[in-house]
């Protein structure tokens, strides 16, 4: 999720890295390029404040989700396991935001080791979070449409599913960590960037392709199909609880699309521009640069919205959280009598 910066190579026999080292978006290719004046990004201080706020809310919200789920070991459901892993992914992603915020103001001042670590952590949890959302949609489809409730088997299998997601996310993220480094290009500040000489463009095109396919298109298609079939099933029923679940499912898909679809569409446009599949003009480059800046903010904010969508709107979650507070003497136990729910449904009822 890098901000696009465009510089022009006017000397094909010159130093490639000096000309292109400061580019963090898709590299242009060829011998000569039309000189484009990059539109400077304003309000960087406001962006830092926003990143800090998102990081704080994500740390707090996802920590509470983890606390509630880990506190109830005996009644933990398959859905709880997915939500727990999703909370871990969002929490780890939020740890990278302070580094990204500082880099917006001062460039990359943390050196190569942290460049690799932050890149790995950010991409790793970006992939795992999206893939977990897709798995949640499949689980809800099976639970509601096909009413599969072999809990013992599902609890056993879900652990392997989550391990598989983490493993695939690690494989997809490793190239970012291996090839990125703190690099100070000619007449510019230090950046955290892949530096492979003339192979940089092809390499980044490959990474972009992986991100488009595994980081958005396949998970989005899975969610739309599974939630679409689930909603169709719910429309045929008249059960109050299932209609409540339908509303939450709609909110989940809507928030995901609002946060992630704009950024991924702009990123796809940037990829097509770098591959010369769409006309390359200075105005278009600057428009994409500004759009990446704005939509990236939406994408990052999704990490702090997940706890609200997946937990805090659930009656069971609120009851379990109050129960923890009551057990530690922080609230009166009489409060729980007004919020008593069926414990065996766990967090599943909110889906």
From Swiss-Prot:
Location within or outside the cell = Cell membrane
Membrane-crossing segments per the record: 45-71, 81-101, 117-138, 160-179, 205-225, 248-269, 291-313
**For side Cytoplasmic, which residue ranges?**
72-80, 139-159, 226-247, 314-351
List the ranges whose topology is Extracellular: 1-44, 102-116, 180-204, 270-290
Molecular function (GO) terms for this protein are:
C-X-C chemokine receptor activity
Cellular component annotations (GO), alphabetically ordered: plasma membrane
Disulfide bonds, which pairs? 115-192
Keywords from UniProt, A to Z, are: Cell membrane, Chemotaxis, Disulfide bond, G-protein coupled receptor, Glycoprotein, Membrane, Receptor, Transducer, Transmembrane, Transmembrane helix
Q: Which domain of life is it from?
A: Eukaryota
Q: Subunit structure of this entry?
A: Interacts with IL8. Interacts with GNAI2.
Protein name per the record: C-X-C chemokine receptor type 1
Please report the organism this UniProt entry assigns to the protein.
Answer: Mus musculus
Gene that specifies this protein: Cxcr1
